[in-house]
Amino acid sequence: MSESRTVLVTGGNRGIGFAIAEEFIAAGHRVAVTVRSGEGPKGCLSVRADVTDSASLDVAIAEVEAQLGPIEVLVANAGITRDMLLMRMTDEDFEDVVNTNLTGVFRVVKRATKGMIKARFGRVILIGSVVGLLGSAGQINYSSTKSALVGMARSITRELGARGITANVVAPGFIDTDMTAELPEEQQADYKKRIPAGRFASPQEVAKTVTWLAGDDAGYISGAVIPVDGGLGMGH
């Protein structure tokens, strides 16, 4: 981006969200992250918020805009998993994931885009997943929410595109995180065999894709799904 922007990243205290916030900070932007616990990277504003709680979001976004200015870039990253095979998954397992990963994104997008509409500029980037395109056994809840983000981004594009607002999905594949590092080596090797690139992505590779989408060079890209998966989900 050619000028400093106000960026909000939800779920910015670890993993991909943390890396995304770091990347925006390094590029000189004003960055806030929502967290339920912990803190975001050095140089950002960390605000306590739960995307399932509208009141906490109202307070958090008001604090961000009071300290950093109207939100110009939103990265909706906060998400949870409740993995279980279909026949064992409870209604609560399904509904909890939908409430965070889909309804939670709606709550944040609705609030953050108010200022974007007034400014006639905005970038909305939703963090999806390759399993939203491929499906995944034991993740009917999670994969359904990630697939739904594609429809959300495209509907935002149709509603708000004329106001200078873009909306896209970044769909990571397997990422090299503490969680994947704890998997048995044999299981890691099996996963890597499925990936044409033969390796997991780094969180920074996802973060750089997000910051590029937020920049001026990607201003004519909207309603797109950008895979960062080493070729795992190609054709979808």
What is the predicted function of each stretch?
Residues L85-L86, D93-V98, T180, Y191:
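Substrate-binding pocket helix/loop in short-chain dehydrogenase/reductase
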Residues V109, T145, A153:
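Active-site helix of classical SDR
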Residues K114, R158-A162, G219:
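Alpha-helical segment proximal to the catalytic Tyr-Lys
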Residues S129:
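Residue(s) in the substrate-gating loop at a strand-loop-helix junction
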Residues I195-V206:
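A conserved structural motif in NAD(P)-dependent oxidoreductases
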